[in-house]
Amino acid sequence: MVSLPITMVINMTGYLLQSRRTLLKQLALMSVASTFPYTAFSKFKPALITRPIPSSGQRLPVIGMGTHITFNVGNDPQARLNRTEVLRTFFDMGGQVVDSSPMYGSAEAVLGFCINRLGKSASPLFSATKVWTSDTEDGKEQIADSQRLWGLDQFSLNQVHNLVNWRSHLDTLLQMKADGHLQYVGITTSHGRRHRELEKIMQSQPIDFVQLTYHINNQDVEQRLLPLALEKGIAVIINRPFSKGGLFDEYQRYPLPDWTMEFDCSNWAQFFLKFVVSHPAVTCAIPATSRIDHMIENMGAGYGRLPDSGMRQRMI
């Protein structure tokens, strides 16, 4: 058995990690470039699409990731290792925004395990979680628990989950932000619930982010909430962009239209995601997956062109 000098092992390990990151990005770019049969790939170098957070100007990639159900795997060692590789792929392909919640079972603990194993590879991380309890003091404890589970000193974003006890929790989060213990404050809803109340909060409260449900078969938020976010300078995170997988059940039996090449789309996942993030009010979408191949498809939506308003109408 041949022993290698430790410096050579370290150099080789660093090279392999860098090669993996480069390879995954090239896979995404190749999927984009494949939609241009007459364009040489060597000349086609699309950039990762980013959008600014209106309150700060910080730019985020338009494709993030959620963890609902997919990271709720408890202490299963093999499942935890799998999720670590899913998260590694996300970062290797340029992802930053990772969203979770105490509501998601063991997801936050599993995320902490994955982030710890990845070390510097889990960077840059834009950490987003939520506070979800009807009691104000319990909410403060929950925030501290989430930081411990993730292994972080502070979060990039904390959000009041589904408007539960939103007045008190919003006070807590805004004070944390004022004290320098939190970068951004947000509020969330899902399934199209409580939109009127959410609209009033967006009108009256100094929030940085709003999170809501939006996909190609549910465009209700285009009427009032998305225009309001643009008007008020509020960043928008989109949850359930695949309608919990329902869009695949409906569309995947059909071939992807040839005209999707016009906005660099290679599969149905990218079709659904590019529709969502092409809306000018949307900052980021957070699809969830437990599979590396699906993560590669999802992240590919963050490269190349996006559909314009005319193409969006054709997609519907």
Task: Place the predicted regions along the sequence by residue.
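Structured C-terminal cap/extension of enzyme domains
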Residues: M30-S34, I53, R224-I316
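Active-site mouth loops of central-metabolism enzymes
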Residues: H68-R80, K130-T136, E262
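C-terminal segment of N-terminal export signals and the immediately downstream linker at the start
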Residues: T35-T67, N72-P77
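N-terminal secretory signal peptides and thylakoid transit peptides that target proteins
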Residues: I10-S31
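Glycine/proline-rich, positively charged
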Residues: G74, T133-D220, R224, L230-I237, ...
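Conserved, mostly hydrophobic/aromatic
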Residues: I53, M65, V98, L111, ...
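Alpha-helix-loop-beta-strand connector modules within alpha/beta enzyme cores
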Residues: G112-S127
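Glycine-rich, proline-tolerant flexible connector loops at the mouths of alpha/beta enzymes
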Residues: D99-C114
